[in-house]
């Protein structure tokens, strides 16, 4: 554990030397990120005898907590110093006339959701909603992701207990809809979802929209045509679009969709596929009679691509200087 103490000391030294919040965030990633020095210490537990692992794990968690507390304290110091500097530099001219009250505007993510709902509404899709506190059946099992399935490891899930959780995707709405009605089904399901991740491109809460069609004679060609029309409508350009083979437990075949960016590079925008027969069976729909396709996309990511925003966290900081750009 001496090596652990050295890591904590090294982290605290780096924290104290961080000159701004961006540098401090780099330190956080270096030590507490998914591949951070302290996070990787948890992988060493498998080398210990079983009876020693709980105590060793507690020591590692205590070390991580020390570093997190130091990060929080330093962040507060930096933010306070920045505020004091700004206040010292600002002056107020009391002779200026009062400012008029400005009209508000829609949040950029709300604009994106409204735009997508409008497009799919014209295609006959209806908006479906479901609970944000979900059970593991609707969030995983019914979507062909049983308890032993390795795909569960891809979700950093907020669990309340062994069966209740904050939903990691809006796919549960599709399951509830298919259980409640027989085909034809044509829905989109926008909503908040939750995953335990926070950095420049991830937040613990974000918005997702999934779409579902189930009917007779639905093919991958229908899926491609629908998404081609949607993406060109959303970005208001005749985009180059490609479908790459991928894997999702609840669709087969599966694909990820990319668009060509202005820099000449492909950008991933959404995932999709034909509804897996097991999913249809789970909700009492005969896959020999019906087929369907599904797609899912992150609202913040599409908003970032549409408006050229580089940091997802800006959408949640309520900075009017940023939000006014979208009025």
Curated annotation (Swiss-Prot):
GO terms for cellular component: cytoplasm. It is found in: Cytoplasm. It catalyses: tRNA(Phe) + L-phenylalanine + ATP = L-phenylalanyl-tRNA(Phe) + AMP + diphosphate + H(+). It is an enzyme of class 6 (ligase). GO terms for molecular function: ATP binding; magnesium ion binding; phenylalanine-tRNA ligase activity; tRNA binding. Pfam families: Phe_tRNA-synt_N, tRNA-synt_2d. Keywords: Aminoacyl-tRNA synthetase, ATP-binding, Cytoplasm, Ligase, Magnesium, Metal-binding, Nucleotide-binding, Protein biosynthesis. Its EC number is 6.1.1.20. Mg(2+) binds at residue 252. GO terms for biological process: phenylalanyl-tRNA aminoacylation. PANTHER family: PHENYLALANINE--TRNA LIGASE, MITOCHONDRIAL, PHENYLALANYL-TRNA SYNTHETASE. This is Phenylalanine--tRNA ligase alpha subunit.
């Amino acid at each position: 554990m001496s090596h652990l103490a050295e890591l904590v000391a090294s982290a605290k030294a780096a924290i104290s030397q961080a000159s701004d919040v961006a540098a401090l965030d780099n330190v956080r990633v270096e030590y507490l990120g998914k591949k951070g020095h302290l996070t990787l210490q948890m992988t060493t537990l498998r080398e210990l005898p079983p009876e020693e692992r709980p105590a060793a794990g507690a020591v590692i968690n205590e070390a991580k907590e020390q570093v997190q507390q130091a990060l929080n304290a330093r962040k507060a110091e930096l933010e306070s110093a920045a505020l004091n500097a700004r206040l010292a530099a600002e002056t107020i001219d009391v002779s200026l006339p009062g400012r008029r009250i400005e009209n508000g505007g829609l949040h950029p993510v709300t604009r994106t959701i409204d735009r997508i709902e409008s497009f799919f509404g014209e295609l006959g899709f209806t908006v479906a909603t479901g609970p944000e506190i979900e059970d593991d059946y609707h969030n995983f099992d019914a979507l062909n992701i049983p308890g032993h399935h390795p795909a569960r490891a891809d979700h950093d899930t907020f669990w309340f207990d062994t069966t209740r959780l904050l939903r990691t995707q809006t796919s549960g709405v599709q399951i509830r809809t298919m259980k409640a009605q027989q085909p034809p089904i044509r829905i989109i399901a926008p909503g908040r979802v939750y995953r335990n991740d926070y950095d420049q491109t991830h937040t613990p809460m974000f918005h997702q929209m999934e779409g579902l069609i189930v009917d007779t004679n639905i093919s991958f060609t229908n899926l491609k045509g629908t998404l081609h029309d949607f993406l060109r409508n959303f970005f208001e350009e005749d985009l180059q679009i490609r479908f790459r083979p991928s894997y999702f437990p609840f669709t087969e075949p599966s694909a990820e969709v990319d668009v060509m960016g202005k820099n000449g590079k492909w950008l991933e925008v959404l995932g999709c596929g034909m509804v897996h027969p097991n999913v249809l069976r789970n909700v009492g729909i005969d896959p020999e009679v019906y087929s369907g396709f599904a797609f899912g996309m992150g609202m913040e990511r599409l908003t970032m691509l549409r408006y050229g925003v580089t940091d997802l966290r800006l959408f949640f900081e309520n900075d009017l200087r940023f939000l006014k750009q979208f009025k």
